[in-house]
């Protein structure tokens, strides 16, 4: 039997899988939204998918750019403006920022080494262990991916393609071979 990976190496592998999985889920939801749906507020106090994408792109870029060497709240970030859509915030531009921010995450996570866990990083001037900073970002990402999927499902209704196990299909799913359990992501309407 092979030796187990040290905790830090195993954890970094899981972080890579988690961020890629969250992005895959969000992308699977976003592809189901028409341009109108992308900008549609579900209610007066909630955010539309476009606002969530803009905010997540800003947050991920800020937290992960120069992750080990600069504060996670970059001076050029304006968090409040991430929730304000302007005519310049086309779907194509927001999705470009989305892709760029996730590339920053993927590149920085890939560059982390187990010995980096001895370092401390700051977010808004507050010290965080590497573990705390990564967990904070994973939690924030999962939270907003869930919002994107909920908004999408709310707007698309019966036209929504479920990205996990559909209601009433758990037994059928559990009976499948693990290699056959992949959920096919929908194409954009």
Residue ranges with predicted function:
Residues 86-100:
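A short, structured beta-strand-centered segment in the mid-to-C-terminal lobe
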Residues 110-114:
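A short N-terminal helical cap/helix-turn-helix that marks the beginning
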Residues 2, 12, 16-20, 24-27, ...:
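Short, contiguous alpha-helical
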Residues 119:
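Active-site-proximal loop and beta-strand segments within enzyme catalytic domains
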Residues 59, 63, 97, 101-108:
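C-terminal ligand-sensing/allosteric alpha-helical core of TetR-family HTH transcriptional regulators
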